[in-house]
Design a protein with these regions (language model features):
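Membrane-interfacial alpha-helical segments at the cytosolic side of multi-pass membrane proteins
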Residues: 92-100, 125-128, 179-184
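Hydrophobic alpha-helical membrane-insertion segments
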Residues: 14-31, 109-112, 152-159, 163-170
């Protein structure tokens, strides 16, 4: 699963490279469609960032951030994410596929991945500590997000017989998951969004994951 298997799979890799990024933008648009009052057209958050760190205007910084996500998001964190994905998608998922269906393996791997985040969620990473239902709602939200993202990454792993595409998707998410927050006013609930690890912000990822689970069906186990 360390080999990228580029030969004959360039079109699939283009989908892996750009598809999740487009899904990220769709997720942000979806969130602000549901909560239009939280959209900050004045880019207040970015204004505070630019005043402290750069001479760029907020709109220029936003444009640069978006272009960075599109162009280098899938590879900027590829080394650490590949190390992690070799464990999740390169080892655990194929092992599970030897005893359960591919569909079940994708979901179980995602659940375990989500539970693995439990300590940092309790520490307040991603969702903070001041929300109703702390820390259980945060844990459940993270598990839901990890299942959604894990199914997408796992499906790419099955199709390309490599953990590299999963690492690329993971890299993009690490580089850009919180990007929609820069477009939001300060009264949002991180359990809901606007970042993609929120329940509403991540709904497009969940819908794609459900579609992929339907596609993968109960097929023979992946050969390790």
């Amino acid at each position: 699963y360390l080999r990228p298997n580029f030969k004959g799979n360039i079109k699939k890799y283009l989908v892996v490279y750009f598809g999740p990024t487009m899904l990220l933008f769709l997720s942000g648009a979806f969130y602000f469609l549901i909560f239009p009052q939280q959209f900050d057209s004045q880019l207040t958050t970015l204004q505070s960032v630019t005043q402290q760190t750069t001479t760029l205007t907020p709109s220029s910084l936003l444009l640069i951030s978006v272009l960075q996500v599109i162009i280098i998001g899938p590879v900027i964190n590829i080394i650490p994410t590949l190390g992690e994905e070799l464990g999740w998608r390169g080892y655990l998922q194929p092992k599970l596929c030897q005893v359960v269906s591919d569909r079940a393996a994708l979901v179980i791997t995602g659940v375990i991945w989500g539970v693995w985040h439990l300590p940092v969620i309790i520490m307040g990473h991603n969702y903070g500590t001041d929300y109703i239902g702390y820390p259980w709602l945060g844990i459940l939200a993270m598990i839901l997000f990890c299942v959604s993202l894990g199914v997408i990454e796992g499906y790419a792993t099955i199709k390309l017989k490599s953990a590299v595409p999963a690492a690329m998707i993971h890299s993009m998410v690490n580089a850009s998951a919180a990007l929609p927050i820069y477009l939001a006013k300060g009264d949002y609930n991180l359990i809901l969004g606007p970042a993609i690890f929120g329940v509403v912000g991540g709904l497009p990822f969940l819908l794609v994951a459900i579609w992929l689970l339907i596609k993968v069906g109960k097929k023979p186990a992946i050969n390790s």
